[in-house]
Amino acid sequence: MDWDIIQNLSSNLVFGILLFAMTIYWISLSFFKWTKNLSQVGKISAIVANILLFFILGSRWIVAGYFPLSNLYESLLFLTWTLLTIYLYVEFKTKSKLVGAILIPVALLINGFANLTLSVDMQKSSPLVPALQSNWLMLHVSMMMLSYGTLIMGSLLCILFLVISKYQDIDLQILDESSLPLYNIMLDYYEAKLFSPSDEVSELGKLKLLQSLDNWSYRIIGLGFPFLTIGIIAGGVWANEAWGSYWSWDPKETWALITWIVFATYLHSRITKGWEGKKTAILGGLGFFVIWICYLGVNFLGKGLHSYGWLS
């Protein structure tokens, strides 16, 4: 049995399923009045894609004998799986089709980049070099990828907040309903837009939606930040074990520190300064781009310890 062929076919199937799910979610949002239950099809498709990704990662782990995070291809698959897992949890809690409409396209692009851009050789498992044969590898890289997945999602909600608010300062203290499920808020907003001629009613629904986006972005970023912190610390221990230095100002390390500072500033401004709305959404939105520079951008430089086994 050629596991490489099976894994490749499964990964391509994931791409097709995610493309289908994205189409379903966008149709469901575009024709909200007539397709209220259509998003369930998209959610089921995402669950199937997530199960397939779990199978791919699990089979690579069993066949190769090590945790499948040793190269760029495997990390992209793991990131896709992480994003889908977090999205499914949030959708289960909120019953919101909006979450799927913005997260599925990102997961699709990541999976497409892994399958359509990387060469066949880069997609194959290969024996680990001595520096990577460490238990710290699983902790460091898995924590970093979990942090990327959660922080990307939280950042996307921040960007969505800025788009819906049209980059305006919105007073979110007017309402005291931040704990409302996002699903109910989506219903308020879209039904007001579709059925009510009153601008006052539609603006109330919009305000509720913005309040919920602000609340959920804060929760998700608050979840991802500890993962990032643990990942950086574990990476330092691993580096000292492998190369005799906790920190070498490698480009990846530098950008990981920048990413940590951006999200630490976001959380600090919310917890101690009481910021919310536009100000924190800008910080969170900035974090989205910083994450991608840290994760992929510095790999194209071909410099530093992290360029080995990824993209050089």
UniProtKB/Swiss-Prot annotation:
Pfam family, one: Cytochrom_C_asm
Listed transmembrane segments: 12-32, 47-67, 72-92, 98-118, 144-164, 220-240, 254-271, 281-301
One GO CC annotation: plasma membrane
Disulfide pattern: none
UniProt keyword Chloroplast present: yes
GO biological process: cytochrome complex assembly
Localization per record: Plastid, Chloroplast thylakoid membrane
Membrane topology per record: Multi-pass membrane protein
UniProt-recorded Gene Ontology molecular function terms: heme binding
Superkingdom, taxonomy of origin: Eukaryota
Swiss-Prot/TrEMBL keywords: Chloroplast, Cytochrome c-type biogenesis, Membrane, Plastid, Thylakoid, Transmembrane, Transmembrane helix
Family: Belongs to the CcmF/CycK/Ccl1/NrfE/CcsA family.
Binding partners and assembly: May interact with Ccs1.
Function: Required during biogenesis of c-type cytochromes (cytochrome c6 and cytochrome f) at the step of heme attachment.
Name under which the protein is recorded: Cytochrome c biogenesis protein CcsA
Species in which this protein is naturally found: Trieres chinensis (Marine centric diatom)
Top-level taxonomy: Eukaryota, Sar, Stramenopiles, Ochrophyta, Bacillariophyta
